[in-house]
């Protein structure tokens, strides 16, 4: 606003508060409404679909306005946050009835996509993480906080590791240092909602100090993060941001955990996406998580999502999970009992977090009591189970008896949603409250008794007690009986046929009854808040309960999925063997029409005899599905789940790499081929002896010979790698790669079989030994409805090309490549030096048979000049 424009006092107050958070939409409490003004009103009206109008604004004449009733905040606030808006809630800080001046207002909360506690903003099956990224000199630090659950985690490492974490945790908001947007988006993309903070926030000493002060410790060694300097900076930035957004009550954030990279299978963002672990690449599609999520509690659903993207790579904890799943199978009564009790738990994790921040409703307090009551039989059942992991869960569950009993004693079983509605605190808890309720809710009975008593004492049968706003409670007596009125009654009003009186008793009762309801609400709120404060000391114990219940829920879900889909327990071991018999794709088999059976397949990989399988076969035959199902079965096993197969022996993998399908990078200007090469390079530069590698149709987007050459070289590199014999499935249309089996002992050819009957192709979807020489692409085109003339012409061209290739002898060169390979030893012609490359090209272009001695000397002199130029 221009300085020379005089605003109304309220609008001046608005713009002063708005200046503190110019990037946020301000919801300004005005009586019974939250209102937005100026640019905020324009944006809010579009997002919320509410009317845009104007408000008088002094000499500025008017300002845009849009608003909604204050009680509809929970409806409209989530819409703004989901639209990626930061929202400043400005409340009235005093009762308008108690002041004649402008009502004092202040910002009571700043809600952002990453800092939300409102149930309508949150998804019960997903965490709502806020992340902070700090760019160090040699590495990067990251921290994640879900204020709705209290989970606080940190890590540091190279950019690709932080990128993986950001994609797996999928934060709703990411903080980083102001001025580093280019660095952030260059490494992590632009898909995140981000917010920049001043550089002073990202300071190691102040961040460490904030963490020590919050956790009330002398150092961070107990959390295992003392050495993570960049992670500490990121974690401190998150605490500072909570302070900036006025989230001061954070007692439920009780620990800071290190994300232990060495505990989990490495899955980069390409693998998570291409395997469709937690989301489908097609709108409305089904992910692995959709298939296996049979969790009952919201905590279980959130934990299962974490397990899917963080499979274990240590066989001991994997087998402990499998033992519990098997126990559920062996003991169906136990499983059903636990299942029944889990239905009573609710979202224990978020409920207790609401207690910490002072946002817990009376009904949620009762739900907390019900959950704690359900934990007792779960604890006893687990303690008596014939399974070590279940007994350990039972040992960690805390009954929290004292707070459970306090809630049962003090809160009614069916309270209202809000404490200010009254009727929350049980009878018998507080004598004053009981008396006030007696006065407020038994008033009619009391007045009737007074009326009967006075009628009998005075002998006036028509006497009645009533109330008006002028002088409160009164006794009305007809004129025919006014001579019977006692002397201590005070006459207040004379009517035509009657007179009205008050008594000292009625005045005292009036004072009690008129203030009783207000006093009840004040006293109930006080008692309720004291109960919530008492909950605080039980937060750590209840959080442990929530984590153990979530774990139990996930394992129960694995058992139910296995039973429903006929999964078996895999053998998970410390070997380099993957031996899957009659394996099935867990997602595809659930999508098949009723009555159609999934065609199961065997896959065997090891580091000694069959390290690499080259799979050929036509389009639509099922090569891609076979690759994915192998990875999914392996991942399910290492999550601790049973798997879709007749038997499965899984030697632990530490990394799974995929080069399957298209990539997001295509949309930002990179060609399909460049994307393939980038992802392939990432795989080849990070191979380990326990890696599982999936390549699907590598080499598209370039010439056939380029594609064959690159595919060949990559397969050869993986086979000949001196340290890492990565188990690999390589699906390809390049049938020339079948020649590799002859010269590379750990490469084996397989094909996905088809039958050709009467010029029609039948896909058998069965993996068989040996390579395939046909892609049947023209048959697929015909099936897709391609015009017959085009199909016929394509067949003619194919016949001509195949004839030409046979005449040129393309099979002979590929065989010679295999026999003439030099393994991992680099020859003169494999060097990357540009001068040597130029010399090589000069020599290769010589026609030695027709070169004269003089021409040879001249050429040698040219080469000498090239060398001197070096």
Swiss-Prot record:
ATP binds at residues 617-624. One of its GO terms (molecular function) is damaged DNA binding. One of its GO terms (biological process) is mismatch repair. It comes from the Bacteria. Keywords: ATP-binding, DNA damage, DNA repair, DNA-binding, Nucleotide-binding. Pfam families: MutS_I, MutS_II, MutS_III, MutS_IV, MutS_V. Gene3D superfamilies: 1.10.1420.10, DNA repair protein MutS, domain I, MutS, connector domain, P-loop containing nucleotide triphosphate hydrolases. One of its GO terms (cellular component) is cytosol. HAMAP family: MutS. This protein is involved in the repair of mismatches in DNA. It is possible that it carries out the mismatch recognition step. This protein has a weak ATPase activity. Belongs to the DNA mismatch repair MutS family. This is DNA mismatch repair protein MutS. It comes from Phocaeicola vulgatus (strain ATCC 8482 / DSM 1447 / JCM 5826 / CCUG 4940 / NBRC 14291 / NCTC 11154) (Bacteroides vulgatus). The lineage of its organism: Bacteria, Pseudomonadati, Bacteroidota, Bacteroidia, Bacteroidales.
């Amino acid at each position: 606003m221009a300085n020379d424009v005089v605003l109304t006092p309220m609008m001046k107050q608005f713009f002063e508060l708005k200046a503190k958070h110019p990037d946020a939409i301000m919801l300004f409490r005005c009586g019974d409404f939250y209102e937005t003004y100026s640019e905020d009103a324009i944006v809010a009206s579009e997002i919320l679909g509410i009317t845009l109008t104007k408000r008088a604004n002094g000499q500025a004449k008017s300002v845009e306005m849009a608003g909604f009733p204050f009680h509809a905040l929970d409806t409209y606030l989530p819409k703004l946050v989901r639209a990626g808006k930061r929202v400043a809630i400005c409340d009235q800080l005093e009762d308008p009835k108690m002041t004649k001046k402008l009502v004092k207002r202040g910002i009571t909360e700043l809600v952002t996509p990453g800092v939300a506690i409102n149930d309508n903003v949150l998804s019960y099956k997903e965490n709502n993480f806020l992340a902070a990224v700090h760019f160090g000199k040699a590495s990067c630090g990251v921290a994640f906080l879900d204020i709705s659950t209290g989970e606080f985690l940190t890590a540091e490492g190279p950019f690709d590791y932080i990128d993986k974490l950001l994609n797996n945790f999928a934060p709703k908001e990411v903080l980083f240092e102001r001025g580093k947007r280019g660095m952030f988006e260059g490494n992590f993309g632009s898909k995140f909602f981000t917010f920049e903070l001043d550089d002073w926030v990202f300071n190691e000493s102040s961040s460490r100090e904030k963490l020590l002060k919050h956790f009330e410790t002398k150092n961070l060694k107990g959390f295992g993060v003392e050495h993570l300097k960049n992670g500490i900076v990121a974690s401190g930035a998150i605490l500072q941001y909570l302070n900036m957004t006025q989230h001061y009550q954070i007692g439920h954030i009780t620990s800071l955990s290190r994300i232990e990279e060495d505990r989990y299978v490495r899955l980069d963002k390409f693998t998570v996406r291409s395997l469709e672990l937690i989301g489908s690449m097609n709108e409305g599609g089904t992910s692995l998580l959709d298939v296996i999520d049979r969790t009952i509690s919201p905590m279980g659903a959130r934990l299962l999502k974490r397990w899917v993207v963080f499979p274990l790579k240590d066989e001991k904890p994997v087998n402990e999970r499998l033992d519990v799943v098997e126990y559920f199978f062996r003991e169906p009564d136990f499983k059903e009992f636990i299942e029944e009790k889990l239905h009573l738990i609710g979202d224990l994790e978020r409920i207790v977090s609401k207690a910490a921040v002072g946002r817990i409703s009376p009904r949620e307090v009762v739900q907390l009591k019900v959950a704690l009551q359900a934990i007792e039989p779960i604890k006893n059942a687990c303690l008596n189970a014939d399974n070590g992991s279940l007994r350990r869960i039972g040992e960690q569950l805390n009954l929290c008896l004292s707070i459970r009993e306090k809630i049962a004693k003090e809160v009614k079983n069916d309270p209202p949603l809000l404490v200010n509605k009254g009727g929350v605190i049980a009878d018998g808890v507080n004598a004053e409250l009981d008396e006030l309720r007696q006065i407020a809710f038994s008033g009619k009975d009391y007045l009737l008794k007074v009326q009967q008593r006075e009628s009998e004492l005075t002998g006036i049968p028509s006497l009645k007690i009533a109330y008006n706003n002028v002088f409160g409670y009164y006794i009305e007596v007809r004129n025919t009986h006014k001579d019977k009125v006692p002397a201590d009654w005070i006459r207040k009003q004379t009517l035509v046929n009657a007179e009205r009186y008050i008594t000292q008793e009625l005045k005292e009762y009036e004072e009690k009854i008129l203030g009783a309801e207000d006093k009840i609400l004040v006293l109930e709120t006080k008692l309720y808040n004291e109960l919530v404060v008492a909950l605080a000391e039980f937060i750590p114990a209840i959080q442990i309960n929530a984590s153990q219940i979530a774990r139990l829920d996930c394992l129960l879900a694995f058992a139910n999925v296995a039973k429903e889909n006929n999964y078996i327990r895999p053998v998970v071991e410390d070997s380099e063997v993957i031996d899957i018999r009659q394996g099935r794709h867990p997602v595809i088999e659930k999508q098949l029409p009723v009555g159609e059976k999934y065609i199961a397949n065997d896959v065997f990989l090891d580091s000694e005899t069959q390290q690499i399988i080259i799979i050929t076969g036509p389009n639509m035959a099922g090569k891609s599905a076979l690759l994915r199902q192998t990875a999914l079965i392996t991942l399910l096993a290492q999550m601790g789940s049973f798997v879709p197969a007749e038997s499965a022996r899984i030697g632990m993998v530490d990394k799974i790499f995929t080069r399957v399908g298209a990539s997001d990078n295509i949309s930002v200007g990179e060609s399909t081929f460049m994307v393939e090469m980038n992802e392939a390079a990432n795989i080849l530069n990070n191979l380990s002896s326990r890696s599982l590698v999936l390549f699907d149709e590598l080499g598209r987007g370039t010439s056939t010979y380029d594609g064959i050459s690159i595919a060949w070289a990559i397969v050869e590199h993986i086979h000949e790698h001196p340290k890492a014999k990565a188990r690999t499935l390589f699906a390809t249309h390049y049938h020339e790669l079948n020649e590799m089996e002859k010269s590379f002992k750990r490469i084996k050819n397989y094909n996905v079989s088809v039958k050709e009957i009467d010029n029609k192709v039948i896909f058998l979807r069965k993996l068989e030994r040996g390579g395939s020489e046909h892609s049947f692409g023209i048959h697929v085109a015909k099936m897709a409805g391609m015009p017959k003339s085009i199909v016929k012409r394509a067949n003619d061209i194919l016949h001509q090309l195949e004839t030409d290739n046979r005449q040129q002898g393309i099979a002979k060169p590929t065989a010679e490549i295999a026999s003439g390979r030099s393994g991992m030893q680099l020859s003169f012609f494999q060097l990357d030096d540009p001068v040597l490359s130029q010399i090589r090209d000069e020599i290769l272009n010589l026609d030695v048979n027709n070169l004269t001695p003089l021409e040879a000397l001249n050429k040698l002199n040219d080469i000498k000049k090239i060398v001197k130029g070096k």
